[in-house]
């Protein structure tokens, strides 16, 4: 992973290491200020505007302070995005039906991704993950995999209810859900909206629900 600017000097690292432990509340305040500054730059001007220098200046901290938590601007950007999304998480309480649960999973993500600043940032992070293996590992583990696991839980519950066959290929079903969303997000050829979410869910269900045609 390429650094966007020079790493802090060793003296800065030593000063940080020697900081008194009683300063933890201040450290947390600094961490939140860094996340807020990074999010402001990210949403206003995109990933390219997020540099350690720019974030440090905006947050009123040293670069050494930033490097204590984030080794690169990409990991900082990902955490800043998570901090912004904290209040927009898909509901986890079951509706009692597979369709209802899948709609509840996808709607919050699509509402956020379809807004211009967030959609642009997600697209930039996906692009970065294609060219930077180290960042790709972080992106997959922290952004992609948790959402896939939420979908797996929903499909497993549907199998237990007898709503879909026990031999349903869950990984393929998860791909069927998220694939169309990312395709529209990255290419921008058609809108990401509520109707599209319903169409994706219903088309996925038609592909995995038992039918007389498949029973023979």
Across the structure, where does each feature detected by a protein language model lie?
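Amphipathic, non-transmembrane alpha-helical scaffold segments
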Residues: 27, 136, 140-148
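Hydrophobic alpha-helical connector segments
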Residues: 90-119, 173
